[in-house]
Amino acid sequence: MKAVLTRVSSASVSVDDEIVGAIDCPDTGGILALVGVGAADSDDAWETMVRKIAELRILDGEQSVSDVNAPVLLVSQFTLHGRTAKGRRPSWSDAAPGEVAEPVIEKIAQGLRERGITVEQGRFGAMMKVTSVNEGPFTVLVEC
């Protein structure tokens, strides 16, 4: 499982020009989490990802999402598992198929909510437009 976590002051995701998820957090900051589920991920990788999103000290003042009750915008992104070593077209064979990935993304969202974290989401499998105001910029790649 891979995720790109970006510290933001606001972020939104739209489908067909309709906002389906948004966070606005100019005081605490928040996290835009682009998460890709891999075909070879372990059954409990989602739990590690929940801990990383909640507890990494990547917000202002070395605080975590849990420390300051910051919101998370969670967006599924299978393209994080694209392989580009050969040719001119990425291979997506390392990404989990949709029927496997979608419930894992839901487990991540639920796991964050169970920690009291506000979670907004994109729409799985949809063509989305993601807008964000990055802080820093501060972006990390998480693999688990």
Curated annotation (Swiss-Prot):
Keyword Ion transport carried by entry: no
Localization per record: Cytoplasm
GO MF entries: D-tyrosyl-tRNA(Tyr) deacylase activity; Gly-tRNA(Ala) deacylase activity; Ser(Gly)-tRNA(Ala) hydrolase activity; tRNA binding
InterPro entries reported in the protein's UniProt record: Daa-tRNA_deacyls_DTD, DTD-like_sf
Motif extent (Gly-cisPro motif, important for rejection of L-amino acids): 136-137
Superkingdom, taxonomy of origin: Bacteria
GO cellular component: cytoplasm
The keyword Glycoprotein appears for this protein: no
Major enzyme class: hydrolase
Covalent S-S links between cysteines: none
EC number: 3.1.1.96
The entry's keywords: Cytoplasm, Hydrolase, RNA-binding, tRNA-binding
Principal location class: cytoplasm
Catalyzed reactions per annotation: glycyl-tRNA(Ala) + H2O = tRNA(Ala) + glycine + H(+); a D-aminoacyl-tRNA + H2O = a tRNA + a D-alpha-amino acid + H(+)
One BP term from GO: D-amino acid catabolic process
Role according to the record: An aminoacyl-tRNA editing enzyme that deacylates mischarged D-aminoacyl-tRNAs. Also deacylates mischarged glycyl-tRNA(Ala), protecting cells against glycine mischarging by AlaRS. Acts via tRNA-based rather than protein-based catalysis; rejects L-amino acids rather than detecting D-amino acids in the active site. By recycling D-aminoacyl-tRNA to D-amino acids and free tRNA molecules, this enzyme counteracts the toxicity associated with the formation of D-aminoacyl-tRNA entities in vivo and helps enforce protein L-homochirality.
Family assignment from sequence similarity: Belongs to the DTD family.
NCBIfam families from the UniProt entry: D-aminoacyl-tRNA deacylase
Record's subunit section: Homodimer.
UniProt-listed PANTHER family: D-AMINOACYL-TRNA DEACYLASE 1, D-TYROSYL-TRNA TYR DEACYLASE
Domain notes for this protein: A Gly-cisPro motif from one monomer fits into the active site of the other monomer to allow specific chiral rejection of L-amino acids.
Protein name: D-aminoacyl-tRNA deacylase
Organism: Corynebacterium glutamicum (strain ATCC 13032 / DSM 20300 / JCM 1318 / BCRC 11384 / CCUG 27702 / LMG 3730 / NBRC 12168 / NCIMB 10025 / NRRL B-2784 / 534)
